[in-house]
Structure formats: C-alpha cells, structure tokens
C-alpha cells in the first residue's frame, strides 16, 4: 500500500470531456496521494474499514471544489459529484491491479440546469448538497439547500453517469415541512432503495420524537401525504451529511466541527427498516485527527468484481484555501481486495 501511494503523488492529468452538453468543460486536476494516517503512513485499518488509497484533488479552475455528494459507477471507472456552486463534476478513476486508488484519468465540469434549461445561479439556487441514482438507473436525483428542493435529472445514456450533463430536470413535490427548515439546514443526504423509496435526511430538521428529521417517500409521483417522517440519531455531536445504498445496506456519513477540536467524521451502517423503526445505526469507523479527515460530505458504495464492498468518501473544501478536497477509498472488513 505504501509504495502504491508514493508512486502516484502529484499526478497531473489532462482531462477530456465525457458529457453530451456543449457547456461541459475539460479541466486539469492534480491528484496527490495521501496516507490514512500521516503520523503512521503504514496504517491501513480504521475500525471496520481497510484503506484502499486516497487523494487530495486540486485544480486551477475556480469552479472545481465544494464537492457535496458523489456517485461511483458500479465498475468503479467513473465518479460523478455535485458542487456547492451548482456544477456536475465527472472524473475517470485510476486504480492498480489490486484495486488501490491511484489517481484520475479524466475530469470535466458542467453546469447543473434549472427546469428552464438555464445554469443555476447564486447560493440560493445552486447549493447542491446530495445526489443519488434512481432505483431504475435512468436518472439522477439532486437535493438543494437555500431554495429547498429535490430535482430529477434524466441520464442521456442510462448507465453513463457523465451523460447527466446538459439534462433538463423536473422538480419533485416536497414533503410537508421541508420549506420550514433553515436555509442552510435542509436536505443533506438522500438515497433510493431497490423498491423505489426515496430516503431523505436533513441537517438541522428536528423529528417530533427526537433525532434528525428524515422522510421516506416514493421517488416518483411524490406526494406530501405519502411521506413518512422518521428520526435519525447520529452519535453526539455529529450531523448526517450523506447516504449511500448498496443492496439492502445504507451507509450514513456524519460530520462534526468545532473551533476547539476541528473537524471529524463517522461512517455508520444501517437499513431502511432500521431507520423507520428508530434503531441506532452501527458505527463502522471514526475519522479523528491524526487520521486524514476534512469536511466529509459525500459517500458512495459499490460491489467489486470479487464481491467486496468498496466505499468512497469525498470532502467539501467550501472553496477555502485552508480546506481540502479529499477522495478516499475503503473496503469493508480487513480484506486486501
């Protein structure tokens, strides 16, 4: 692992556009390898997770950064992310023969569009926070803060995440109470289940029975009366920042920040039924310095060719020079696959 990480330091890769939109722009991204623990570079096990490589991503393009949600393709060849400025980011992923993440091969930026086919503008309209593939794999659901909403963006080519660029969205009907949430405390995480249920977690909503407010509702033909409220109890003092589903398992990413202790994160595992019943999630790993961590905001899970669970986590640098855009890869358990 150590040698693999060292050999990919500061990969500067020319990127090519993969999306259908004329506004999709190829960008250059620098990928610098980062150890799981800078104080112990040989460390690879964190709780129930095994480190499979990580990168710090930077670009000269001012619109690159602020990654707040992520989907990794089933074959792990591509990654689609959304940003706080309302952009799609599509990147090709590079791994070695052992599956260790080495870098990126391509990268492109394209504006997320409104229902009127115009690029989203300003924090109120463009603050994308969560993203999920629909259960049938034909569209991307994206959640926004500011003007709280969930938009459905059809894929130009089902199976090709990057083909969402240039898509004209439709707006899903919001559950009752969503618009009462603070501008910066709305939907922070979402995922779809195999049966077409959309699971939503807020950042600052409070459930009647305690915990962070969430909803379960149909992902299509959404009606406020069909939304089932539930409360999610993250470990104190964390708040949920993203959800990812793999088969019947839900992975919940959570974050905490304080001036005194800095930033930290928790990854937990649960199911839709457990969420509905108010059962506590199972903690898999805790990201606390000196472990590599930043403003953890996006998680995606895929099944490898050999059947292992691979988990990808991205951080949101808020377009701040003192924060980082991290892309970290893990496998569940202690397998080297």
Question: What residue ranges belong to the model's regions?
Answer:
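Positively charged n-region of N-terminal signal peptides that target proteins for export
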Residues: 1-4
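Bacterial N-terminal signal peptides
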Residues: 6-14
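Sequence/structural signature of beta-propeller domains
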Residues: 16-337
